[in-house]
Amino acid sequence: RFVKKMGYDSFPELKYAYKKEEKEVSLYMVNDLDETIDCLKKFNTPYYQDLFKEVAYILGDANMIIFDGMGDSAKIAEYAARRFSGNGFFSAALTDPYQKVSMDGTDIVVVMLSISGDTVELIRKANAYKAAGSTLITITASDDNTLAKMSDYHISYYINDVRNELSSHTTQVPALSIIEILSNMTLHMCHDTLQ
């Protein structure tokens, strides 16, 4: 009866379908891991190292660093604020997508994290940050998006955006790695400057 309820005529047919699906899921996970590893390896190239140094210098020179994002990117923003605060930098996460931005943004650097870079609420906030005079750094999965085009500095990590109709399943490992690289570089640059 179970086999019939699952939509199959026989147990061997069910078993075959299960094994086929299991193989497809396994293949997807391997490809996804390969893509993530390839993405992380790019961060050691001269292009990325120079970009990271430039952005780390901007972050180290800021009076305040604000990290902003929505959904899964909000969690990365919260981690980033905690990481930079732990290194002695005045930083905060502002992850409410409807929070009004009203401040004097001079000497404030805003780091916006978004996979797509085209989320309406984040674009609205980015416009407000820019209007307030903040320096805008964006970290997204590509450079062909609205946030990337409106930012002062942009870091793309070029990974496929995996979504279904309900949510994103795109890995956040590259964004997390970028935050850790920037945090370490900023700390070392400021430490070296003080000596």
Give residue ranges: language-model regions.
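Glycine-rich phosphate-binding loops that contact phosphosugars or nucleotide phosphates
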Residues: G60-H191
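HTH-adjacent hinge/linker in prokaryotic transcriptional regulators
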Residues: R1-E54
